[in-house]
């Protein structure tokens, strides 16, 4: 998927629109929406039109780093081929991207609501990471990070590897530090 296709799809999904509904709003045929979301090269004016139909607008930001919506699409792709290691690497890269930016540029990286990864634990991890890093910079978190579908009542792990220890028996952050980094306890 190209960056533009990810943006169009995420914008449409964030407004809970079908491709047909977006096509009707933009006076395009549904196949044009599908091609644009599928990564086919679309003209800039078509991308602008589709984003506007979903109530979004394309802006330029002074960064080359991927935003949360783009990273979520990468995570979804890696999970679909059962590659949790690469999915985790993408999540870590999102963290690095957010930490590398300051002020409003950091906020821009978390602004657009990502499409679901199709795994609620990963969706919650993305939301939690974005909320944490934006608040760390004194920025408000976007509404999508507080959606009930992106939260769990009890702590969960990403379950990357079956050999990963179960953290449920460790009750405090201090014990976590002891368990994982004895020198820091």
Predicted regions span which residues?
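Charged, low-complexity intrinsically disordered regulatory/assembly segments
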Residues: 116-185
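Key DNA-contacting residues within the recognition helix of helix-turn-helix
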Residues: 9, 34-35, 48
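DNA major-groove recognition helix of helix-turn-helix/homeodomain DNA-binding modules
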Residues: 44-61
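Recognition helix of helix-turn-helix/homeodomain-like DNA-binding domains
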Residues: 27-42
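Short basic helix-loop element that most often maps to the first helix and adjoining turn
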Residues: 6-21
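Alpha-helical residues within the helix-turn-helix
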Residues: 13, 24, 38, 52
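Helix-turn-helix/homeodomain-like alpha-helical modules used for DNA recognition
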Residues: 64-129
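Short amphipathic helical patch at the helix-1/turn junction of helix-turn-helix
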Residues: 2, 12-14, 41
């Amino acid at each position: 998927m190209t960056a533009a296709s990810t943006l169009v799809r995420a914008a449409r999904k964030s407004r809970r629109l079908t491709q047909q509904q977006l096509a009707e709003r933009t006076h395009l045929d549904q196949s044009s929406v599908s091609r644009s979301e599928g990564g086919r090269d679309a003209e800039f004016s078509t991308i602008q039109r589709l984003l506007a139909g979903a109530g979004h607008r394309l802006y330029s930001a002074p960064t080359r780093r991927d935003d949360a919506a783009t990273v979520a699409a990468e995570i979804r792709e890696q999970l679909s081929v059962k590659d949790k290691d690469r999915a985790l690497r993408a999540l870590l890269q999102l963290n690095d991207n957010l930490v590398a930016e300051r002020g409003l540029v950091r906020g821009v990286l978390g602004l657009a609501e990502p499409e679901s990864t199709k795994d609620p634990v990963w969706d919650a991890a993305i939301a939690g990471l974005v909320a944490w890093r934006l608040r760390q910079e004194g920025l408000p978190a976007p509404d999508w990070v507080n959606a009930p579908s992106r939260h769990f009542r009890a702590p969960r792990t990403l379950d990357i590897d079956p050999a990963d220890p179960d953290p449920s028996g460790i009750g405090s952050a201090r014990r976590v530090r002891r368990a994982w980094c004895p020198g820091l306890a």
